[in-house]
Each structure stands twice: as structure tokens, then as C-alpha cells.
Amino acid sequence: RGFFVDIGVRDASLTRANEILGEQQLHLSALDFSADLGGLFASARGAPLAGKGRFDVVDADLRKLLPKSGVNWDAFTAHALRSVSATSEFRISGDTLSLTDLELSMDETQASGNLEIENLSADPTYHFNLNVPSLDLENFLHLSATGPFDGLMLLNLPAILVAQSEVTGLLKIGTLQSDGVAMSDVVMPLRAHGGVIVSSPITGRFYGGEVRIDTVLGVDGDLLDFRTRQQISQCRFGEL
């Protein structure tokens, strides 16, 4: 019981935001939000906001939206993360934001899954479960590493953005291309705490056999400490 309010936004563009330098690029095709009217008035007086809805972003330039992230964009290709689209159901409850049925599109790469962020106003805690049918790292990163799986380890790079937060999640990749090396059925757990990012064990199918990779990435300001162990078993490469 009670009164509810439905808010809808259509075909809106973000061009400038406080504390973000320069012009922005974000095109919001649709945003729908439903909340209890009394709760909405209470949130205007400082009470936690509660409600649910759906959004559809058709074009977002993450580089322009994250100018203070500290990410070295030189490690990425010229067009990587320049145009990202996303749709999702969402729910806000107090200090927690939940995204379900999340669908992401980054050029030729698609992803789907769920994301939950707790403690939005203080020290955020992230939980995610994402599935990527096919991923070619050369579409995103300049791969200058010498080892066959060094490109795979670079999947840890986005976690640098939240390295000082609490993060737990699972990334599954159906087919992964990295510097000419192909893997399938990749499962990558990730945990971050206090500037330390652990991905272990990363597992996948590799030319008839299996591969296991364990990585630990330490972030201290501008300094990175990257450690890894790679193990390959029962692979068949044919004639060399």
C-alpha cells in the first residue's frame, strides 16, 4: 500500500559533469525509476533512497568519464572503451546498488551478468559475476609481453580502479584470444583487498590440454608489483 511515483527519461545526453574536466560523451536512451513517494521525499531530507528501475545507455566514452581514475590509457588501443553500451535492471536499497540482467557491448565484445555495489557513500564493496562469449585482447590492449599468457594477466588491469576496495567476483570467457594464443572455457576468479588483487586459479582449455595461472598484483600509488605462476598440462601442438 502507499503511493508510488514512476520517473522516465528518454533520449538524454550528458555533456558536462561536476568534478569531471572536459566534455563528456554519454547518451542515455532510456531510464525508468519507480519509488515509494514518501520514501522519495524522505531521501530529499537525507534518508536512504530505495527504488528500482531499468536503464539503457547506448553510447558512453569511459575514458572521458574516468579522467581521474589513474589508468594509463596508453596501454589500451586507440578505440578501446570509447563507445560502450549497457542495459540493466537495477535496484537501490539504502547504500546498495544492484544491477541484474546486465548486458554490455564494447565494440565487438559482449558481456552479461550481475553486479552489486555495497557501501556506496563510504568504502564501496563490489561483487560481480560476468560472462563473455568471446574476447580478443588485441582489441583492447597493446600486447608487448613475451610469454604466451601474459596478455591474459592483463585482464587484472581494470581491477586497479578498485584495488583499494573490497572486490570479489567471477569472470567466465567462452573463447579468449591473446597475442595469437587461443583458450576456451576460461574461468577467472578475482579478489581485491587493501591494494592487493588476487586472481587464482585462472583455468582454461588450451590446445587439448589445460592451463592454470595464478596472479597477484600489488598496487601502491603509481607502483605495481606483478607476480604470476603459469602451468600447462597435456597440450597437443602438432608439428613444430
Predicted features, each with a name:
Residues 1-37, 41, 45-96, 101-110, ...:
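Small-residue helix/turn framework positions
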Residues 150-158:
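Long, charged amphipathic helices and adjacent flexible linkers at domain junctions
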Residues 178:
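Active-site-adjacent "gating/activation" loops or surface patches in catalytic cores
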Residues 181-182:
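Low-complexity, polar/charged sequence tracts that form flexible coils or short amphipathic helices
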